[in-house]
């Protein structure tokens, strides 16, 4: 056994070296060198028959040729028979040689088209990490384990379920590359199925940014001479008549000198330095500086110190609520936001909000439950006109504006690029499909505003969009806006272990079934989820996490479950402030790798981080 374990360790180390080399932008191996790393030492005993030996399988199917029925009689399991038969038929060309057949069945090398391959290589020929077969991000798979039950579509290992002529392949974690072949050693030959190739420009997926000198405090003290935006637009001089007109009534810090046309951050925008530019669409753009990462949740200690929990538990007076937006452009609703007509305004609690408060003083909806009517009066359904279908969730923030995720509207890997004329919003709904007469309101859209630095190509950074309604909506017991957090609220509540709430009409479980009734809820679902430590979030994925994101969900050892799932995207992650009894939207459902998978979490757009961008757009286009 020691000999076998040593060979196994040798194989793992060889694979680790290969992955390291493939991810380099400058080092690519010759085929013979790659093959020497990819080929795995033979074990003392046949691993395939150590795992699969049942009945007379070896005698029936290796020493002789067998039928599927004979294989089933030996294995006595439909799933194991499917898996064995897929490999056995893929190895048909080498059945006459026992040694070659066993090598082919073990699956550590490719025979023919490589449909027999069952190894654990999980990078493509150009060095991109493979997407999990069960995941829908960043690509929606057309090939899955239901279609090919014997293809062993586990984890993110390279496979060839559909008989691709290029050999084993996978969907990639790069949104710009849907699927790509892998470089797999061919059985008994000194070559691989696909030669290793460099990617032009290198892959940015899974690679952390280099350690360089960064700009602190999101550029609030930046005094550099950069005068061009990230889109290449020249900045207007701060003293120009156009810039002065746009700056009128803005809350600028007088300590920030607005010199010439250099990028500055006079309003403390969490997005960083910016400047005015000529003409449409927004008259302002952000500048491309390398900012130091400063997550809001790590600032909590400075704000509350060790007395944070005591401050919440011992609260005696309600915090004064200060409106943030200009009502002329934002519309009505902010002064009364987050106070639900059927609960807070009626002095009632919903069934699970106590769980949220207890998490404060203690430190896709899957596994959720039916929401009470009026529980989330800010919940919005984004509805596609043709074909008619639920597209995403969203939230009402005033009588004129709706907040959602940018990827609901623009995501080329899923062929999404919707305009105002493609969509409408349904507000006040409880039922997923039924039209709720005299309760729900349907509104057309006037304009869609997507964050200019939304990064769909890599990691959905700044996954946020604003929808302006064509006409103001009328509030009711079932339609009411949610609050958006200020810094004080964000620092008090966005703490690891504190629970927030996600609502939506998304799938109840992750599945490939074709029957919608099995996975789609009939009414709005709700689940309470704890915020997760930032380091744990980063360690749970190979995708680069930014400070415009946070993650939430239960850890494998916590004994509880829950997550957002397909269809919940764009919906709100809300928390109730124990200081003023208002509900605040802290996040937007953005992305996740599968639904409710152990060790994986849901990722949310950090609303407070992007609030200044929202203010600029609303001030400019809300009139």
From Swiss-Prot:
Disulfide bonds join 61-66, 91-104, 109-187, 130-170, 158-182, 214-292, 235-275, 263-287, 337-483, 392-408, 537-551, 565-595. Residues 25-43 form a propeptide. Residues 1-24 form the signal peptide. Activity is promoted in the presence of negatively charged surfaces, such as polyphosphate and dextran sulfate. Inhibited by SERPINA5. It is an enzyme of class 3 (hydrolase). PANTHER family: PROTHROMBIN (PTHR24254:SF10). Heterodimer (named alpha-thrombin) of a light and a heavy chain; disulfide-linked. Forms a heterodimer with SERPINA5. In plasma, interacts (via N-terminus) with alpha-1-microglobulin; this interaction does not prevent the activation of prothrombin to thrombin. Belongs to the peptidase S1 family. Thrombin can itself cleave the N-terminal fragment (fragment 1) of the prothrombin, prior to its activation by factor Xa. This is Prothrombin. The gene is F2.
């Amino acid at each position: 056994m020691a000999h076998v374990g040593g060979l196994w360790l040798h194989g793992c180390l060889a694979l680790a070296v290969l992955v390291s080399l493939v991810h380099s932008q400058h080092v690519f191996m010759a085929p013979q060198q790659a093959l020497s790393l990819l080929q795995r030492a033979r074990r003392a005993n046949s691993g395939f028959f150590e795992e699969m030996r049942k009945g007379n399988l070896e005698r029936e199917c290796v020493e002789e040729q067998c039928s599927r029925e004979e294989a089933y009689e030996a294995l006595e399991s439909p799933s194991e028979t499917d898996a064995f038969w897929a490999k056995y038929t893929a190895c048909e060309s080498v059945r006459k040689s026992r040694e070659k057949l066993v090598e082919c069945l073990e699956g550590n090398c490719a025979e023919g088209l490589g449909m027999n391959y069952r190894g654990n290589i999980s990078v493509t020929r150009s060095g991109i990490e493979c997407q999990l077969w069960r995941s829908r991000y960043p690509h929606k798979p057309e090939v899955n384990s239901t279609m090919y039950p014997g293809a062993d579509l586990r984890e993110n290992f390279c496979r060839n379920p559909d008989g691709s002529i290029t050999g084993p392949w996978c969907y990639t974690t790069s949104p710009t590359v849907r699927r790509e072949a892998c470089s797999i050693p061919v059985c008994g030959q000194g070559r691989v199925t696909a030669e290793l190739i460099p990617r032009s420009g290198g892959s940015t997926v899974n690679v952390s940014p280099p350690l360089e000198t960064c700009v602190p405090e999101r550029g609030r003290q930046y005094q550099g001479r950069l005068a061009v935006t990230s889109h290449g637009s020249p900045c207007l001089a701060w003293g120009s008549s156009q810039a002065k007109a746009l700056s009128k009534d803005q809350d600028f810090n007088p300590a920030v000198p607005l010199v010439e046309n250099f990028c500055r951050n006079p309003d403390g925008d969490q997005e960083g330095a910016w400047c005015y530019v000529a003409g449409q669409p927004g008259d302002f753009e952000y500048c491309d500086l390398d900012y130091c990462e400063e997550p809001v949740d790590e600032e909590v200690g400075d704000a509350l110190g060790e007395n944070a929990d005591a401050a919440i538990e011992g609260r005696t007076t309600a915090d004064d609520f200060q409106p943030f937006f200009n009502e002329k452009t934002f519309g009505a609703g902010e002064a009364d936001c987050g106070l639900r007509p059927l609960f807070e305004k009626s002095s009632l609690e919903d069934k699970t909000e106590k769980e949220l408060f207890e998490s404060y003083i203690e430190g896709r909806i899957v596994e959720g439950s039916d929401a009470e009517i009026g529980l989330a009066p800010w919940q919005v359904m984004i509805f596609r006109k043709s074909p008619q279908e639920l597209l995403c969730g969203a939230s009402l923030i005033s009588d004129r504006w709706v907040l959602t995720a940018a990827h609901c509207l623009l995501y080329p890997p899923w062929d999404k690029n919707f305009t105002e004329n493609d969509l409408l919003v349904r507000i006040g709904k409880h039922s997923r499909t039924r039209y709720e007469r005299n309760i729900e309101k349907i509104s057309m859209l006037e304009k869609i505003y997507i964050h200019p630095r939304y990064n769909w190509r890599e990691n959905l950074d700044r996954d946020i969009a604003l929808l302006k309604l064509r006409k103001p909506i009328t509030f009711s017991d079932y339609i009411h806006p949610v609050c958006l957090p200020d810094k004080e609220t964000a620092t008090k509540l966005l703490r690891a272990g504190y629970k927030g709430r996600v609502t939506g009409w998304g799938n109840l479980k992750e599945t490939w079934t074709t029957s919608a009734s099995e996975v789609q809820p009939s009414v709005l679902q709700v689940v309470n989820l704890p915020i997760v430590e930032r380091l744990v979030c980063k360690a749970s994925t190979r995708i680069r996490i930014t400070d415009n994101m946070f993650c939430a969900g239960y850890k494998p050892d916590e004994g509880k479950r829950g997550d957002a799932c397909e269809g919940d995207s764009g919906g709100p992650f809300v928390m109730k402030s124990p200081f003023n009894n208002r509900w605040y939207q802290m996040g937007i459902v953005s992305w996740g790798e599968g639904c409710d998978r152990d060790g994986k979490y849901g990722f949310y757009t950090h609303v407070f981080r992007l609030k200044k961008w929202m203010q600029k757009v609303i001030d400019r286009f809300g009139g």
